[in-house]
């Protein structure tokens, strides 16, 4: 556990360097320009500065908040791109499964279904379908041809529903028989799975909005109270004292970390559904 925490801390500092952050994001199939990186940092630091002044924090404490956020900023960015990557993978799987079923119902040939499905796909899954087609068209060995050809797609996405569909398509391809009703059942299952997942994501997005709204409202009320107290000379001295400064720094730090932590937690539940 301790070793895992050390690795997480080292990775956090590793990603502070833009080139390392960019390389990680590129691994998910996206680009993140240095201009966007600087703009995001600037807006974040501006928000921290305004919040600090709003709560009458002294400059050293505001700088401390900025440095703390800088450490977490790359991880927040990476998690956002990772979520986009996982979301795209989910859409790829759903589109692939539905189109394979529709195509195979019209003509029960795997190679034909792959060719038709390919027309509606793009990105990584398109390349994998090409690989599967080539493996079927130019077999090295005839034994278990279709299972071997489709395995490259299964290994990439590791989806139980995909493997179940492939197993059934291979069975029909090799043995024939009635297949329409079973494919209809599989298709209904895929649609229900898709609807459940999208509904879950919608609920999580709503929860994320409520978290942001609650944080903003709490900070606004607390900040307004501080502004009112600052007009009193005696209370103004309290606001400049070390007890208030340290306590406010700690609370703002918690608020600052609460959003990315809750965001990451919700996203992890969405993609893991």
Positions of predicted regions on the chain:
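Hydrophobic alpha-helical segments characteristic of transmembrane helices
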Residues: 2-20, 100-117, 160-200
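Juxtamembrane/interface alpha-helical elements of multi-pass membrane proteins
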Residues: 60-148, 273
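Hydrophobic alpha-helical transmembrane segments
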Residues: 56-67, 238-250
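Membrane-interfacial helix-loop-helix connectors in multipass membrane proteins
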Residues: 147, 154, 226-245
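Single conserved hydrophobic/aromatic residue that forms the stacking wall/gate
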Residues: 265-273
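Membrane-anchoring/interfacial helices and their immediately flanking loops
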Residues: 1-6, 136-170, 174, 181, ...
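Membrane-interface, cytosolic juxtamembrane amphipathic helix immediately N-terminal to a transmembrane helix
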Residues: 10-47, 86, 180-217, 231-239
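Alpha-helical transmembrane segments of multi-pass membrane transporters/translocases
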Residues: 217, 243-263
């Amino acid at each position: 556990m301790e070793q895992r925490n050390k690795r997480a801390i080292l990775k956090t500092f590793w990603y502070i360097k833009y080139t390392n952050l960019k390389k990680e994001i590129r691994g998910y199939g996206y680009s993140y320009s240095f201009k966007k990186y600087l703009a995001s940092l600037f807006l974040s630091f501006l928000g921290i500065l305004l919040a600090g002044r709003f709560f009458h924090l002294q400059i050293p404490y505001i700088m401390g908040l900025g440095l703390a956020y800088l450490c977490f900023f790359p991880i927040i960015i990476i998690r956002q791109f990772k979520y986009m990557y996982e979301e795209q993978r989910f859409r790829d799987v759903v589109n692939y499964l539905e189109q394979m079923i529709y195509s195979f119902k019209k003509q029960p040939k795997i190679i034909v279904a792959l060719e038709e499905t390919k027309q509606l796909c793009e990105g990584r899954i398109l390349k994998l379908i090409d690989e599967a087609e080539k493996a079927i068209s130019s077999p090295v060995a005839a034994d278990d041809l279709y299972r071997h050809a489709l395995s490259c797609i299964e290994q990439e996405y590791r989806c139980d529903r995909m493997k179940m569909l492939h197993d059934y398509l291979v069975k029909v391809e090799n043995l024939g028989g009635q297949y329409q009703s079973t494919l209809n059942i599989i298709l209904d299952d895929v649609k229900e799975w898709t609807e459940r997942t999208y509904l879950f994501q919608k609920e999580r997005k709503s929860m994320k909005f409520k978290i942001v709204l609650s944080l903003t409202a709490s900070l606004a009320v607390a900040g307004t109270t501080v502004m009112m107290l600052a007009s009193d000379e005696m209370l103004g001295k309290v606001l400049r004292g070390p007890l208030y400064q340290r306590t406010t720094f700690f609370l703002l730090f918690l608020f600052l970390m609460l959003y990315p932590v809750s965001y990451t937690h919700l996203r992890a539940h969405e993609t893991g559904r």
